[in-house]
Structure formats: C-alpha cells, structure tokens
C-alpha cells in the first residue's frame, strides 16, 4: 500500500489548534468539546478486534462497518474513484492504529447507524452523515435521527466547518464539483495525542478552548429555518426537497429560552407555508379588531369572495389574509342579515304568486267589449287560425309580476308545487277537452256576429288570415285542416280559381248550425278503413265490367283523364284540354307501365281509338296497371310468347351436361350466368330459335319438372363428394350451396309460369 510507513506520525502545535502531519499531509483533529471520553475504551477494544482480523478476506468490509472515522458521501457518477479513495483512507487508519492513538468518539449508537448505512452499496445513501453531537454544556446523548434529518444537519455543519483533506478527497472534489451543494462529502478525522507526549488534562484543556477557529459546538447551534430554506434554494436541490419534507419535529433544535421557542415556532409555520404550499390552520385568537363586512345579498357576498379566492390561488403567501377575510365575512351577524332578506323575499313572492287554478278560475268571459283587445294581439301572432279560447288571460296593472325565488327561501310545501301543478294541469286538460265547445258557446256569443270585431280584423289582418279565420270560426275541428289547406291554396295564383268555389260553399254554411266534436276511437278508424277498401274494390269491379260506351254515357264520376291515342299497342302523349295537372300524372303512369305490357294487350286498348273521351278513375286504373306490371316483372322475355308455340329439343336436352364453376362466388360482378351453368339455358335457346319439336304446355311442364329434379340431384352429389374428399375449402362449399338454392329458385319460377299457362289457356 502507498501510505504504509513504519515511522510514527509527527505532531505540530500551533496555538490552540491541533494539526496532524502525516507523510507531508496536514490532517486536522477533532476537538473534544463534543466527544465524551466514556466511549474511548469501547472504540479502542473495537479497533483491537479489527487488528486481529486483519488476515481475513473480509477485513475491509469489517473495518468499513465498524470504524466511524471516515464518513464521505460518494456520488453515483464517481463510484470507481470513490472505492480507491476509501481503500486509501482505511490504510491510513491502520497506520494511525499502530501508533496506539487514543480516539474519543461520540455516541456509541453511531456504530449501529453507520453499519446499517454502509451495507447499501455505492449509492448516494451509502455512507450516512455524522448525527449531531450534544451541546457542550449538556453531556446527554442525542437520540438517533433518520436519514432525512441527518441530511439537513449535514448541510448546517458543512456550512460552518468543512474538513476536507487534500489527499483523501481530491478525486471526489473533481468529479462532483457541480453538485457540491447537494452531494458534497466530508470526512471527520478524530485524532488524539499519544499518551507519552500529551496527557488527558492537556488534551481536554486544549479541546475545551472556546477561542479556536474550528469549534464543533457551533455546528450544533441550528440556524433559523429561513436560512436553511435559503441554503436549499441556493444549492438547487429540488429532488432532495421533494423527498425530505420540512416538519417541526425534524428541524426543532434544543431550545434554551421560551422567547426563542416562540420565534422558532413562528418561523417554522411561515417557512412550511411558503416552501411547500401547505394549508395552514388559522388561529381565530390572533384576529385583531375584525372589520364587520355586511354584503347586501348572497350574490354580493360571492362577488366579494371571488377576488380573494383568485388571489389565494395565485399567491400562496397571502393565504392567511384570505382566511381572515373569509372568517370575518362568515360571522353570525352576516348570516342573520342574509336570512332576513331571503325570508322577506320569499314572503313577497308568496303573496304575488298566482297559481294555474286561480288564473283558470279568474278567466273573464269573452264579450264584445274586450274583443278589440284580443284583436290587437292577433296580428302579432303568425297563426292562421285564431283559437280564442286558448288566448292568455290579460294581466291587470295592479298585479306585480312573479319574481324569481330561490330554493333556499322556499318551504317544503312550496317545493312540491310544480309536481302538483303538473298533475292538476293534466286533469284540467282532460276536462277542458270535453267541455271546450260548451264553454266557448254557452258563455260567450259568436265572435263572427260582432261588427266591431269584424271591422277591427279587416283593418289589421291580411287577406289570407282574414279569410281563414272566418272559416275556422264556423267549422268543427275535423274540417279545420281542410280550411287551412284551401287558405294555403288561395295564396297561389294557380289554385285561386279552383278553390274559390269550394270556399264559397264552406262560407255559406249557416252560423247557427251546431257542430259536435266527437273523439274517434280505434274501432271506428278500423271500420272506416275496411269500408274504404271495400268501396274502392267495388268501384273498380263496376268500372271493369262497364263497356267503353257505357262509361262515356255515365258521365264524369271523379277526376277525368284526357283521351289516349295508342300506336302499336303503346300509349302516346295525349291531347290535354282541361285539368292538365291530373291528366299528365295519369299519362305518366301509363307510360311507365307500357314498357312491360305484352303484345296481346293491344286488343284491350284498341277500343280506345274509337272513342273521343273516356273517363276512367285514376286510382283504379293505376292499380290495375301496376298489378299487371308486378305479375310480369319477373317473367323472361321468351315466356311472353303464345302458349301454343313451344319448342324443345329432347335429344339435346338429355345429352347436354352443363359446366359448373364451383370456386366462383355468387355475388361477383364478372361471374358467369347461372342459366349457362344449367339446362334451363338450353330450354330458353330452343324457345327463342324455335328448335326441336313443338310441344303443348302439359308436356313441356312435365319435362321441366324432371330437369329440375335431375339438376338438384346433381348439385347434391357434388356437394357430398366435395365434403368427403376435403380438397374443397369451406368457402367453395358455401358457394356451391348458394348456387344450388339459386338454381332451384330459377327452375321453380320457370315451371310455375308455364303451369299457369296450362291452367289459364
């Protein structure tokens, strides 16, 4: 080892300071002001045990756990260099031990503390700091501190005295220079004189000297907590501040006087509030001359407290003033004033509240004297029909409007009023719906007979509303929709002439006719629907049985069509003279249906050429044509030939084997047609080209049924073989099943068509 030397160390005295010179390196010694002599024998015995175990492999570990002489905080970034320095320090301790040096230690509990901390490895908390030593006047052993408390004590001690030997911590200082405020380690080297040169009396006299430049007793005098917070802020140790919370038990030193205790308590509360933003419990005894704040209402009180809440959020140091203002604003006298105002407001609103039942009972009768008042309200509304029994009740000038009332000023009975009001209004709606016509007609005269009302309406209402209002007053509710429809048609110039006659008929109804409004039930609606369907079917049968000549002689029944001229069995554009709109709609229906009409339908339309005008009902004719279109929509064009001309090549049909595409999907765009993959394609080709033998419908239907069964059996065999061989995928099997279903459907439709021809030749 580098520092091993057989020569004893040299000592040099300079005044009251003790300095140890070892191989040209000056090492300061710890004064005995904070080290009790009672533990010297224990440490000497411990060091002798270390010397006996020097030959073992675990020598360095045992010395590291037992010896408290070297305490250093080693940074994680310089773990390799710190191991070398630690080994050099241990070698130095062995050399000092050979010179039979008496070492005085602090509390004996320190050995256990350092032994636990040294087991943690080369991390930041590997070597803990020296716990605070007792006061010079008190020789009591201080209790053990936790790691966080030792870190704060380390900061204060390192500020007052820094004992860094040049040869021990050179690499540590170079590697951790940027983090000296947070991770700076210091080594306390305690050293005493040899028993032969200096006795205990001289050593104690030297250590207890208060005029020394380095005094550990000053390190025990804790500074104020504001200085500690300044040290933390200056070093920039944000991570340490997050893991070491400030508490009164941690930072509270040994106090000597009650004045200092009070000062320390005040500084502790202020520093904890400013640094950590903790919520402080406000002491109401410290409020001096509170200023009474009397806001006029709860809203003003909330407005006064709003800026205080914002100020407390933005600045945590003003928390005490905010709490004081909120406590003052919440005094009992303020609460009493707010309650009086709320109760006064609730009493005022309770007097002015008009319930729905009171307004309904106080409804004034509608007479001719107040008709002008309602006439002035009518133009402001955009309603076409004027329902006078639904107009609001006029409010007199003596009544005050209902004021808004908060829930805090309401009693339990008033809070239930909306529910009772809804229930009562539902019952009143039921009764008013039954007695509405009786109330309006027995209590009030007819409004249309009032000359003043008519004159005022003529002066203020437009023509459309005036015409519809005169109609609505004389019609039951069932006819109101009709009158509104006519009034809308009157606004259009196209329908003005057509609707004027019907309007005159409606206006000419007598005023004294009593119309009774009856509520239609579900059974009556169903009966009316059935009668309407039956009447439509009877009318269509009668029209179909009538000949064209008889239809002309019967005259116009409903709306009339113009004449239809057909060319080659297809209707062309008609010559319209009257009712252009209705006739064009009818012809468009004929044109849409004429594309699918067969050639045989020309015989039915041929009598129309001879007649000038044929009046056919629109609804029945459209239904007839649509029924024909729906029956022939799914019919193939080859099936529209005459049933007597059926051709089929039986030999080709028996020898033909269709090609099936198994792996082709049924919904692909470019897929081959299913008719080409079946024998039905051959049948269609024979019909189109008239190839083969001429057959009647009965024989043809039998042949088609046989082919359908054969083809279905063929698909079944293919499906069974593919499933047993297992070379076909599941998707292909699904395609095959879908094709089988589709082909059966095509064959069924084809056979059904010719079977219908057979039944109806």
Swiss-Prot record:
Region (Disordered) location: 1-82, 229-320, 590-640
Processing after translation: Phosphorylated by CDC28.
Biased amino acid composition, Polar residues: 13-27, 244-259, 266-276, 590-604, 627-640
UniProtKB keywords: Acetylation, Phosphoprotein
N-acetylmethionine PTM sites in chain numbering: 1
Low complexity: compositionally biased ranges: 28-45
Superkingdom to which the source organism belongs: Eukaryota
Name the UniProt record assigns to this protein: Uncharacterized protein YOL036W
Species whose genome carries this gene: Saccharomyces cerevisiae (strain ATCC 204508 / S288c)
């Amino acid at each position: 080892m580098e520092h091993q030397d057989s020569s004893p160390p040299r000592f040099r005295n300079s005044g009251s300071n003790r300095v140890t010179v070892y191989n040209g390196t000056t090492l300061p010694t710890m004064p005995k002001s904070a080290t009790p002599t009672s533990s010297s024998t224990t440490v000497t015995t411990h060091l002798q045990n270390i010397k006996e175990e020097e030959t073992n492999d675990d020598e360095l570990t045992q010395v590291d756990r037992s010896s408290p002489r070297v305490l250093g905080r080693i940074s994680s970034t310089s773990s390799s260099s710190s191991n070398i320095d630690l080994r050099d320090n241990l070698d130095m301790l062995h050399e000092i031990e050979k010179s039979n040096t008496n070492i005085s230690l602090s509390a004996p509990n320190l050995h256990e503390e350092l032994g636990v901390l040294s087991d943690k490895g080369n991390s930041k908390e590997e070597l803990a700091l020296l716990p605070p030593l007792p006061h010079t006047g008190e020789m009591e052993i201080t209790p053990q501190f936790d790691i966080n408390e030792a870190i704060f004590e380390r900061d204060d001690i390192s500020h007052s005295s820094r004992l860094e030997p040049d040869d021990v911590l050179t690499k540590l200082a170079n590697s951790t220079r940027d983090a000296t405020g947070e991770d700076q380690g210091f080594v306390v080297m305690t050293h005493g004189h040899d028993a032969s040169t200096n006795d205990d009396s001289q050593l104690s006299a030297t250590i207890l000297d208060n005029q020394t430049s380095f005094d550990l007793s000053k390190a025990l005098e804790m500074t104020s907590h504001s200085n500690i917070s300044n040290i933390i802020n200056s070093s920039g140790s944000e991570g340490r501040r997050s893991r070491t919370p400030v508490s009164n038990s941690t930072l509270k030193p040994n106090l000597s006087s009650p004045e200092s205790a009070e000062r320390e308590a005040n500084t502790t509360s202020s520093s904890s509030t400013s640094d950590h933003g903790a919520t402080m419990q406000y002491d109401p005894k410290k409020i001096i001359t509170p200023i009474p704040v009397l806001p006029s209402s709860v809203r003003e009180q909330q407005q006064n407290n709003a800026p205080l809440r914002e100020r407390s959020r933005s600045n945590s140091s003003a928390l005490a003033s905010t709490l004081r203002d909120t406590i003052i604003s919440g005094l009992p006298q303020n609460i009493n004033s707010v309650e009086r105002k709320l109760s006064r407001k609730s009493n005022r609103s309770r007097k002015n509240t008009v319930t729905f039942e009171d307004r309904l009972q106080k409804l004034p009768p509608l007479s001719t004297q107040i008709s002008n008042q309602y006439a002035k309200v009518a133009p402001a509304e955009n309603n076409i029909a004027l329902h006078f029994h639904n107009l609001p009740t006029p409010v007199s000038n003596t009544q005050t409007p209902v004021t808004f009332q908060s829930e805090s000023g309401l009693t339990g009975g008033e809070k239930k009023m909306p529910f009772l009001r809804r229930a009562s209004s539902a019952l009143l709606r039921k009764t008013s719906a039954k007695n509405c016509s009786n109330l309006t007609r027995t209590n009030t005269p007819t409004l249309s007979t009032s000359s003043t009302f008519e004159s005022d309406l003529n002066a203020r209402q437009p023509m459309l509303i005036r015409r519809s209002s005169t109609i609505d007053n004389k019609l039951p509710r069932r006819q109101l929709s009709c009158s509104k429809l006519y009034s809308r048609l009157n606004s259009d110039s196209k329908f003005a002439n057509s609707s004027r006659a019907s309007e005159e008929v409606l206006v000419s109804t007598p005023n004294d006719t009593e119309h009774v409004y009856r509520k239609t039930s579900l059974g009556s609606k169903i009966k009316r629907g059935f009668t309407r369907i039956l009447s439509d079917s009877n009318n269509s049968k009668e029209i179909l049985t009538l000949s064209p000549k008889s239809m002309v002689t019967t005259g116009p029944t409903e709306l009339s069509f113009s004449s239809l001229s057909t060319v080659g069995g297809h209707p062309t554009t008609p010559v319209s003279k009257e009712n252009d709109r209705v006739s064009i709609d009818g012809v468009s229906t004929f044109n849409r249906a004429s594309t699918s009409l067969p050639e045989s339908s020309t015989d039915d339309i041929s009598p129309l050429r001879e007649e000038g005008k044929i009046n056919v009902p629109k609804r029945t004719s459209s239904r007839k044509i649509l029924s024909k279109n729906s029956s022939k929509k799914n019919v193939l064009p080859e099936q529209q030939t005459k049933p007597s001309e059926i051709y089929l090549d039986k030999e080709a049909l028996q020898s033909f084997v269709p090609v099936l595409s198994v792996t082709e999907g049924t919904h692909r765009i470019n897929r081959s047609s299913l008719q080409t993959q079946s024998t039905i394609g051959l049948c269609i080709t024979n019909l189109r080209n008239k190839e083969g033998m001429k057959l009647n419908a009965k024989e043809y239907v039998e042949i088609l049924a046989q082919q359908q069964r054969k083809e279905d059996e063929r698909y079944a065999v293919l499906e069974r073989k593919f499933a047993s061989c297992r070379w076909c995928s599941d998707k292909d099997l699904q395609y095959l099943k879908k094709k089988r279903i589709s082909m059966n459907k095509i064959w069924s439709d084809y056979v059904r068509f010719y079977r219908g021809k057979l039944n109806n030749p």
